[in-house]
């Protein structure tokens, strides 16, 4: 990949080995006059780099190398290495929002329920890869039971039994799988998507709506718009942020921070 950058651009490539090494990389990034931080990897890698430059003048660029590449796709960046490096070199920049879930930053989506449950099982599975993820998903699809949640936002409180709740800063999980097609990255708002309990047969209708980019039109889905949200559940359990699972307490607090991150975008970006 190194030879593909234009000759007039100075860059340094660093491969970090562990958390301590990554901290050293960040020290270098912030102590010198670098203008951009380019993350090469999937949404987990992108999250690590992005959260380290929130509120700075350093712009995030992405060379997508993951399975979903949700943020890269939303930013209109190419999945082709040569093309995305051209986009990075052109350097078109905008500012986007980021969210926090119990003070943990995320940039695409976060949530609780089925998707967090699957992420937690996959993280502890001995088998890796897409095949293992799909196998776990189908195994758990009808085993998993919807849970009761209390949501507080916009001076209201609602109680819902939900299969999952997704808090979307960006509209998609990845792979152009849009759970919140009307969400915008720079409007200072989350789209809170509640998937209600469904039957075996109705799940296909939900999937068709999502695959067509019309999840908000499904009768099994409710969507609300807010910049702050508190979700309370009866017990501790997994959440996810940009697909990364973590066990968290009963109360989950979300906050949206308006245009807090500078990013490099492609010509097809429509998030403003």
PLM segments and residue spans:
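ATP/nucleoside-binding phosphotransfer catalytic cores, i.e., glycine-rich phosphate-binding loops
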Residues: 159, 194-272
């Amino acid at each position: 990949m190194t030879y593909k950058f234009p000759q007039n651009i100075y860059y340094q490539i660093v491969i970090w080995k562990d958390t301590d090494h990554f901290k050293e990389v960040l020290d270098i990034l912030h102590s010198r006059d670098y203008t951009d931080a380019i993350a090469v990897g999937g949404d987990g890698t992108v999250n690590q780099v992005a959260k380290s430059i929130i509120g700075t003048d350093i712009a995030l660029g992405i060379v997508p190398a993951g399975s979903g590449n949700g943020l890269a796709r939303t930013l209109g960046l190419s999945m082709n290495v040569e093309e995305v490096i051209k986009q990075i070199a052109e350097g078109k920049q905008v500012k986007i929002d980021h969210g926090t879930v119990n003070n943990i930053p995320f940039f695409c989506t976060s949530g609780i329920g089925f998707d967090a449950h699957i992420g937690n099982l996959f993280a502890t599975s001995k088998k890796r890869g897409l095949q293992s993820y799909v196998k776990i998903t189908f195994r758990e699809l009808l085993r998993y039971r919807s849970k009761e949640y209390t949501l507080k936002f916009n001076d209201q409180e609602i109680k819902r039994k939900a299969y999952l709740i997704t808090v979307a800063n960006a509209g998609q999980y990845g792979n152009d799988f849009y759970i919140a097609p009307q969400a915008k990255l720079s409007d200072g708002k989350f789209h809170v998507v509640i998937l209600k309990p469904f039957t075996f047969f109705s799940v296909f209708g939900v999937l068709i709506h999502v695959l067509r980019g019309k999840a908000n039109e499904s009768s099994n889905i409710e969507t609300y718009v807010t910049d702050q949200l508190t979700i309370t559940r009866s017990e501790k359990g997994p959440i996810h942020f940009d697909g990364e699972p973590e066990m968290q307490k009963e109360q989950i607090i979300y906050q949206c921070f308006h245009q807090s991150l500078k990013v490099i975008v492609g010509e097809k970006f429509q998030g403003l």
